[in-house]
A protein has these predicted regions:
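Covalent nucleotidyltransferase
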Residues: 130-132
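Conserved donor-binding loop and adjoining core beta-sheet/short helix segment
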Residues: 27-128
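Short amphipathic alpha-helix that is part of the acyltransferase structural core
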Residues: 1-27
Length: 133
């Protein structure tokens, strides 16, 4: 189970990830996005997350740039993101169409890529099979 609690973007925890900082929230705010910050409470992981709300063609999109910083166990990525998305959806405006994550976590394909000597990721249609709908 994951719960999120809203807070000010100036209260984001210090991090080496530029895209999850109060500075980035300010930059994106000046570019017309609406930044929001949330503390994450979960048995799997902890931390906080910056969410950027963008208006696009009459719809609102939620973007999570390079976050959340702290991943769950590798086998729990999908379930964790589903639970986090549901928790965030309860705190976002109802007209947000979807949440997009640009995860800073180790790829689920990293070990296999190294062992097999792959030069690139599997083709998109195969990677997307892991997508949560």
């Amino acid at each position: 189970m994951v719960d999120v609690i809203a807070k000010g973007t100036n209260e984001l925890h210090p991090t080496d990830i530029l895209f999850q900082t109060p500075y980035w929230a300010q930059v994106k705010s000046q570019m017309g996005m609406a930044p929001m910050a949330f503390d994450i409470h979960s048995s799997e992981t902890w931390g906080d997350v910056l969410v950027l709300i963008k208006n696009h063609c009459g719809h609102k999109l939620a973007l999570v740039p390079q976050g959340p910083e702290h991943p769950p166990a590798e086998g729990m990525y999908g379930q964790y993101l589903e639970d986090l998305s549901l928790a965030l959806a309860d705190r976002l405006e109802p007209d947000v169409a979807f949440i997009r994550y640009d995860l800073p976590w180790k790829s689920l394909y990293a070990d296999e890529m190294q062992q097999q000597g792959w030069g690139s990721f599997p083709e998109a249609r195969l990677r997307e099979m892991r997508m949560n709908m």
